[in-house]
Amino acid sequence: MTPSLSAFINSLLLGLFIVVLPIGTALLLVSQSDRVTRN
């Protein structure tokens, strides 16, 4: 694997991590908080 490809994959994973983590946390918090309304 070339250094540029490795750097590209690393940045892709980092971007994915930065995007997915807050969204996942927000969804989790919302699903925890409105559990009463959806029974």
Swiss-Prot record:
This protein's UniProt keywords:
Chloroplast, Membrane, Photosynthesis, Photosystem II, Plastid, Thylakoid, Transmembrane, Transmembrane helix
* GO BP terms in the entry: photosynthesis
- Which chain regions cross the lipid bilayer? 11-31
Keyword GTP-binding found: no
**Where does the record place it?**
Plastid, Chloroplast thylakoid membrane
* Plastid recorded as keyword: yes
Mind telling me which GO cellular component terms the entry cites?
chloroplast thylakoid membrane; photosystem II
- Recorded topology in the membrane: Single-pass membrane protein
Principal localisation: plastid
Its assembly, as annotated, is: PSII is composed of 1 copy each of membrane proteins PsbA, PsbB, PsbC, PsbD, PsbE, PsbF, PsbH, PsbI, PsbJ, PsbK, PsbL, PsbM, PsbT, PsbX, PsbY, PsbZ, Psb30/Ycf12, at least 3 peripheral proteins of the oxygen-evolving complex and a large number of cofactors. It forms dimeric complexes.
Q: Which family does it belong to?
A: Belongs to the PsbX family. Type 1 subfamily.
Role played: Involved in the binding and/or turnover of quinones at the Q(B) site of photosystem II (PSII). PSII is a light-driven water plastoquinone oxidoreductase, using light energy to abstract electrons from H(2)O, generating a proton gradient subsequently used for ATP formation.
This protein is called what? Answer: Photosystem II reaction center protein X
Native organism? Guillardia theta
